[in-house]
Amino acid sequence: MHKYDVVVVGGGHAGCEAAAAAARLGTNTLLITHKISTIGEMSCNPAIGGVAKGVVVREVDALDGIMGRAIDRASIHSVILNSSRGAAVWGPRAQADRKLYKQAIQEIILNYNNLTVKEESVDDFLIESNNNGELCIKAVITSSGEHILTGKVVLTTGTFLQGVIHIGEQTTPSGRMGDKPAVELANTLNKYDFRLGRLRTGTPPRLDRGTINWSILQEQVGDNPPVPFSYLTEKINQPQVSCFITHTNENTHKIIRENLHRSASSYLSDVVAPRYCPSIEVKVKKFAEKSSHQIFLEPEGLDDDTVYPNGISNSLPIEVQREMIKSIKGLENAEILRPGYAVEYDYIDPRELFHTLETKKVKGLYFAGQINGTTGYEEAAGQGIIAGINAALSAFEKKESFVLHRTDSYIGVMIDDLVTKGVIEPYRLFTSRAEYRLAIRSDNADRRLTQKGYDISLVSHERYSVLQNKLESIKQLEEKLGSLTITPEQLRSYGIKISYDGIRKTALDLLSYPNIDWNKLQEIWPELSSVTRWNDKMGHTKADNRAKNEICEAVEIEAKYKPYLIRQEADMKFLREEINTQIPIDFNYSQVKGLSSEVIEKLQTIKPATIGIAKQIQGITPAAIVSILVYLRNRKTKVAANFV
């Protein structure tokens, strides 16, 4: 009978990060998956990252996770979303060669120290009570009846838990096209009274590249040079390709409307789908006034003829999907290689978890990924690494756990949202969910988290050394900029007008002004030109060379955000102090500027009595709470003024 310190069930994005993290910490770890050949499979879109999501990938990488390095080896179209806006909303995103990404993940996982991979399915657990009457994991039981002893299990079932695929009226028990669902495991969770719910998601049809008329479509070129995700990647080496844009039209919508009754969404109305990644059926129904919807045609690989039409996820019958596709510009002759479909699956109420992602009902059992009601590769990876870390620390019987907080990471925001608010629809990360988003950006994940990982022996010496070199270089540059001064009068000769107070400003002070950048500083102090080129090597590795290019950017971003961070902290202090503020029962939320229709709808329906209660409602962001508080305070001030 085999025994392992940690057993991870599931080889998707959550499972791979959990297994790698547990193994990095030195535990004897087993990863059990249905098929070794599907480890690292990108089940839906062939891309990693995005707004908020890209920050999570950087955070996972800062903790020595594997997703960032894998996508850097597979990236064929890279962009920084929102690059024209502030760094707090930058969203690194990379289109992947699907085969290369899976190959990269498998090469990493199958050669990882302390990690064994087994092709099998888990149907049950052996759970016993300890001396304190607590239920504890003792073993996993496979479909072949084998008992594998362990005290720590991380369950990452994705969409496989009682999974059912829908294509029109046709239904097939499956967690992913071509893969069996996990039925017995769902029964096991029911047996131990876990609160299970049902969610669904979907995917679009895949198209044949050679049957698309690319010449009449709008080309979308990626960034040049492409920016890597991992702090250990010097540069992207894969050839870069373009994506293309087309649109649905009135005829497309007519075809969809006439067949809505045949879509899975018509008979799965009680199973909630992702609000922020809706199917084309939902778009046509919900936004009836729109004459078109955008579609991104994304290549799935350099030597792959498959194209992913991002924006038309659906569960219509195959013949309707064909008719719909041929109504779209550029796709008149397009052939479908695989139809789109919806998949429904079980999830557990994440409020049954601690912030470590250990279950409250069974000691030693952890959940990560879509089983917790989330959607997205990145959200899964972020949960997986935290669950794997805590399972390993607990296996060593260490008293401390590893918990990230809302103040230090998007992973912390996500997990706190899940375990305190729960979910009523597939959860997706957004910058609006993070009250400290000005501080937890994509550019500083290593400076926020790598030290935390190193302190528990999770992070390699190589990564830690790169960080230390980077921090020292940032410090040196800030000191240099702090030593260069100029008066407001002198600045006017360079066309810069600031407060005429006679006080000398340092170069670092000037960087905080929105209209002053590195180019302007070099004009004032030409000696800074040599600094920005960084001709001297910063360290001893290629990763050091990557990091040195980020030094000037890091210093400028920190300078620009400093006054806003002070204001952000003041807002959060205001929020903490006003948590018991009462909200009138007849309060009209639509009068509050900046609230989304989703937030207004939920608050008008629930009618929370206090700010504290409103804050706990799923989907209500900290920014929304601050806006309501400011409105209430201003209204109170106006009322008081009328009595003066």
From Swiss-Prot:
GO cellular component term of the entry, any: cytosol
Cofactor(s) the record lists: FAD
The protein, known as: tRNA uridine 5-carboxymethylaminomethyl modification enzyme MnmG
A GO biological process held by the record: tRNA methylation
Protein's UniProt keywords contain Cytoplasm: yes
UniProt keyword annotations, A-Z: Cytoplasm, FAD, Flavoprotein, NAD, tRNA processing
Cellular compartments annotated: Cytoplasm
PANTHER family: GLUCOSE INHIBITED DIVISION PROTEIN A, PROTEIN MTO1 HOMOLOG, MITOCHONDRIAL
Amino-acid positions noted as binding FAD in the UniProt annotation, renumbered to this chain: G10, G11, G12, H13, A14, G15
Record-linked HAMAP family: MnmG_GidA (MF_00129)
